[in-house]
Amino acid sequence: MRPASALVATVLALASAASAAPPVVHELFPAGGRRGTTVDAVFGGADLGGAVTVVGTFPGTVGIRRDAKPSASSLPVRFVVPPDARSGEYEVRVVTAAGVSAPRIFVVGDLPEVLETEPN
């Protein structure tokens, strides 16, 4: 490859990497769970398709559910809440190759999570 061609290829590769947007999380639903339970939840937002992991202060484990088909706007995850977890609010963030999202709150408590049914 000629030096000029190599330079152009390098600049284009860097430009495409720099233009990748970090993940944006608008919502987490459900946003909480009871101690000692497993909660399937979904992050909603933008640029979530390349999610690598979920990090934060949550005391249990959080895994990306590949079986539920993640997309650019929806990231299904599974929270495993330890039985001895302290009740309270914990920050969680989505990590992609382009960056880290702003935090969302996941609440751990003693009461069951009750999903609303329509109509009210």
Regions found by a protein language model. Give the residues of each.
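Intrinsically disordered, low-complexity boundary segments flanking structured domains
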Residues: 11, 92-93, 119
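Short, structurally constrained coil/turn elements
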Residues: 14, 19-21, 57-58
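N-terminal secretory signal peptides that target proteins for export/translocation
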Residues: 1-2
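Beta-strand/beta-sandwich contexts
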Residues: 20-50, 100-119
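Bacterial N-terminal signal peptides
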Residues: 5-15
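Immunoglobulin-like IPT/TIG beta-sandwich domains and homologous Ig-like subdomains
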Residues: 37-38, 42-96
